[in-house]
Amino acid sequence: MRLLWKFLAVVLVVSFFANGQESAGKVSKFDDAEYLHLTGADKKTATPIRGTLGFNNETKIVEFVDKKNVPAFSIKYDAIKSILYERTSTPRYVAALLVSPFFLFSHSKKHYLTIQYTDDAGTGQFVSIHLDKKNARDVVATAEAATGKKVEREEEK
């Protein structure tokens, strides 16, 4: 019995130190995100690119990689000016027409993260990412912790 307790104590100590080392150089990745790439001046012409949003604490870069592992953008933490989290809410008209009028009382919610930054030339730029509802809170918390910037929150009800 004592051997079992000693073994468990050693496993706990080793896992504690191993977790501490992983968090120092950790890359936080969030799947099921969509980068809304603007192709023109009109916001309606944005093409969604599905991929993974990542916060790399070693290189201090926010990056988005599409499904084919091609980087769509990478932003240095120092270049970030502000981060905005938005949650929008819209009625479900189609479901109300097709299924039941009671769907008018429920709303679909979408989550967006907008990062405003300056590029190498010093001009202001921004990127907008549509987040998955399952990990939107984790993305906001990670963005705040990794970059050191306060994330502004704007939520529609």
Predicted segments — roles?
Residues 42-43, 66-68, 117-121:
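Short acidic, glycine-rich loop/turn motifs
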Residues 21-28, 79-157:
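Acidic, Ser/Thr- and proline-rich intrinsically disordered linker/docking segments
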Residues 6-15:
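Bacterial N-terminal signal peptides
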Residues 34-36, 60-64, 113-117:
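Short polybasic amphipathic segments
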Residues 54, 74-76, 128-130:
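Generic structural detector for well-ordered beta-strands
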Residues 58-89:
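Mid-length scaffold segments of soluble, non-membrane domains
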Residues 19-59:
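Anionic N-terminal interaction surfaces
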Residues 1-3:
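N-terminal secretory signal peptides that target proteins for export/translocation
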